[in-house]
Amino acid sequence: MSSSITPSLIAADLFSVDGLVAVVTGGATGIGLMIVKALEENGAKVYIIGRRKEVLDKVAKEEAKHGNIIPLQGDASSKPDLERIVAHITKETGYINLLVANAGISGPDPVRITPSTTLSELQRDLWSLDPSIFAQTFSVNVGTAYFSIAAFLPLLDAGNHKGNVVQSSQAIITSSIGAFGRVPLAHYAYSASKAAVTHMTKQFATALTKYKIRFNILAPGLYPSEMTAGIVKSFEQLSPEERATRVSPLGREGNTEDMAGCILWLASKAGAWLSGNVVVSDGGKLSVTPSSY
């Protein structure tokens, strides 16, 4: 059956986020900031949530192209903070179309296994981890996403009723290629937490279908951020051949344009028929790494 409405195949229309209202947790640095800049520069109104007020204010002042980055100080792992922020947005705007749950931590230092590592040395390194640090990694990387989703569901539902954009409301959760790789790129706690948040998001995508709220997962490889600064710096002196092996087959880490392309696709009409998907942006790293993706 043909539609009486002629679809627009113009990229500027398909990938437009003009008029979209978004919330990005952990939006003041790293991948979160890349997402915020891409959305706001293309016409979205973006609330950014983070703990450091001075960093949030600096982003709003220096990075906003249209004055539509609104800083809201708060800890996305705190239920009282989330309730306060939701109340503020409800009063000011009344709805959102997109939640990007991006807040997270890297967790413990990786456990290194070299050709000379003995089993007793490995056991010592594994056993020495403070259980509270292991638990914190899950609490932040999984729990923060869970409670952010729960907190913003009413505003996402209101976005569907508002109908200011064609696509239905959506939550995008930042995971990692660490969720899929069998060679641990970080500590086991980090990789496991990202696998957990990935599966949880897929379950939300299934559970909330009747409410027309979509859920998708963004799984980045190596991007520059506060969290990865040391890793990125350590790769600077590598030869092109070494970079292709250790960083990605494309020989580089991700950049703002790479992340902007992902988020504009997912958040716009171009991605309106996506739900329960995992978008891997890693320069092909998982293609050359043992993985379960």
Curated annotation (Swiss-Prot):
- InterPro entries attached to this UniProt entry: NAD(P)-bd_dom_sf, Sc_DH/Rdtase_CS, SDR_fam, Sec_Metab_Biosynth_SDR
Question: So where does NADP(+) get bound?
Answer: I31, N102, Y190, K194, S225
GO MF annotation list:
oxidoreductase activity
Q: Which Pfam families match?
A: adh_short_C2
Q: Does the keyword Acetylation apply?
A: no
Keyword Transcription in the entry? The reply is no
Top enzyme class of this protein? oxidoreductase
Protein role = Short-chain dehydrogenase/reductase; part of the gene cluster that mediates the biosynthesis of the phomopsins, a group of hexapeptide mycotoxins which infects lupins and causes lupinosis disease in livestock. The role of phomF within the phomopsins biosynthesis pathway has still to be determined. The pathway starts with the processing of the precursor phomA by several endopeptidases including kexin proteases as well as the cluster-specific S41 family peptidase phomP1 and the oligopeptidase phomG to produce 10 identical copies of the hexapeptide Tyr-Val-Ile-Pro-Ile-Asp.
Q: Which family does it belong to?
A: Belongs to the short-chain dehydrogenases/reductases (SDR) family.
The name this protein carries in UniProt is Short-chain dehydrogenase/reductase PhomF
**Encoding gene, per UniProt annotation:** phomF
